[in-house]
Swiss-Prot record:
Belongs to the class-III pyridoxal-phosphate-dependent aminotransferase family. HemL subfamily. Its main location: cytoplasm. The modification N6-(pyridoxal phosphate)lysine is found at residue 272. It catalyses: (S)-4-amino-5-oxopentanoate = 5-aminolevulinate. Homodimer. This is Glutamate-1-semialdehyde 2,1-aminomutase. Its cofactor is pyridoxal 5'-phosphate. It is an enzyme of class 5 (isomerase).
Length: 433
């Protein structure tokens, strides 16, 4: 049951202690609740679509470990697989047959992946993909899109400069300008600027990396023809195409966004779902490109915990469950019901907001403007979102604690969960000034 009268005594105590130990009190910035105010809660356990904090407050969870938990928390098959693997040890520093089994499951779903290398995070996978692209092409520059997040490696943690075609400036202290100067940042869904960028710098560009459905600046799908234009143009200039499917892989479809859009990238970056909730990342692609990696080729990459048996076991269990009972029809039904109800609220209430959805991913944007690029997202009403988030949290609904993030559905969510979310959204927005 949802506990509507909440207290956060233990969470507040832990938060005060955490601030003495961790920078900003957290091990990942968004968890600080800095974007929404107040202090974060601390989780004691989770099961299905619910999480419970240390004070005993229950929440319906729409963060789902940032998309990793497509079957919800503590799915029996995943828990069982990790428990069995744990009996055989936590890490070997050597090869395991589990690596091969998980790789085969991924290959069977994504034909573009002829060879694959496991790493420990999406950041590491994106960093490796860029190194591969530079190594095989002999070129140094890369293109990315404003609002697309590819982890916190130096070359990719950048935003656009004063003009759409300028080189990027660092989005963090500690990044030498000489590194970010090799990254060109383009506006999302802008074909004309894309074509101009390739005309000017395409022959110097090793790769263009993108989330095929932008999901780290809220949810912003590509407009019709945009990905096809990008792929065709990249081919003309000999530029590799890297799909960052850390979020969309195995979530939009079994074959990810590349299945949905019918595009086979040169390299694919994966994470989240393929680890069943444990730390993992992967980069895969064409054999001739992937064979540039050491020990076969001259592009170096290594990792002590790469292919960790616990993460491999969890990933195998999750992907086998997906193949055994494909969740996409159920998730689309839930998502469609949610979208229809939210659109009805939009018609009834004067509060200006947008609701974007693709499959089991969705975002609320407090603005009257249609959202088609990161620039549109940056102008949303952050104070209104903060009020919205906090009111939902105190109603037992946990959305991502930032106006710039995407929420997720899982197979553990029920129609009752959706009805409850819709009810609270309506009640909160009806009272909002």
């Amino acid at each position: 049951m949802i506990k509507l009268e909440m207290d956060f005594v233990l969470s507040e105590k832990l938060w005060k202690e955490a601030q003495e130990i961790f920078p900003g009190g957290v091990n990942s910035p968004v968890r600080s609740f800095q974007s929404v105010g107040g202090f974060p809660f601390y989780v004691s356990r989770a099961k299905g679509s619910k999480i419970t904090d240390v004070d005993g407050n229950d929440y319906t969870d729409y963060v789902c470990s940032w998309g990793a938990l497509i079957h919800g928390h503590a799915h029996p098959a995943v828990v069982r697989a990790v428990g069995e693997a744990l009996k055989d040890g936590t890490s070997y520093g050597a090869n395991s047959p589990l690596e091969i089994k998980l790789a085969r499951l991924i290959q069977s779903a994504m034909p573009s992946i002829e060879k694959i290398r496991f790493v420990n995070s999406g950041t590491e996978a994106c960093m490796t993909a860029i190194r591969i692209a530079r190594g095989v092409s002999g070129r140094e520059k890369i293109m990315k899109f404003e609002g697309c997040y590819h982890g916190h490696s130096d070359s990719l943690l950048v935003k656009a400069g004063s003009g759409a075609l300028t080189t990027a400036v660092p989005n963090s202290a500690g990044i030498p300008p000489c590194l970010s100067s090799l990254t060109l940042v383009l506006p999302w869904n802008d074909r004309q600027t894309l074509l101009e960028a390739f005309k000017r710098q395409g022959k110097e560009t090793a790769a263009v990396i993108l989330e095929p459905v932008l999901a780290n600046c809220g949810l912003i799908p590509p407009e019709e023809g945009f990905l096809e234009c990008l792929f065709k143009t990249a081919r003309e200039y000999g530029t590799l195409v890297i799909f960052d499917e850390v979020i969309t892989g195995f979530r939009l479809a079994l074959g990810g966004a590349q299945e949905i859009f019918g595009i086979q990238p040169d390299l694919t970056v994966l994470g989240k779902i393929i680890g069943g909730g444990l730390p993992v990342g992967a980069v895969g692609g064409k054999k001739e490109i992937m064979d540039s990696l050491s020990p076969l080729g001259s592009v170096y990459q290594a990792g002590t915990l790469s292919g960790n048996p616990l993460a491999m076991a969890a990933g195998i269990a999750q992907l086998e469950q997906i193949k055994k009972a494909p969740p996409y029809s159920h998730l689309e039904t839930l998502g469609s019901e949610l979208e229809s109800a939210i659109k009805d609220i939009q018609r009834k209430l004067p509060i200006p907001f947008q609701f974007n959805r693709r499959g089991s991913l969705f975002s609320f944007f407090f603005t009257a403007k249609n959202i088609r690029s990161a620039t549109d997202v940056y102008s949303v009403d952050k104070k209104r979102f903060s009020c919205f988030f906090t009111s939902l949290l105190h109603s037992g609904i946990f959305l991502p604690p930032s106006p710039f993030e995407t929420a997720f559905l899982s197979t553990a969510h029920s129609e009752t969960d959706i009805d409850e979310l819709v009810k609270f959204v309506y009640d909160i927005l009806k009272k909002m000034p």
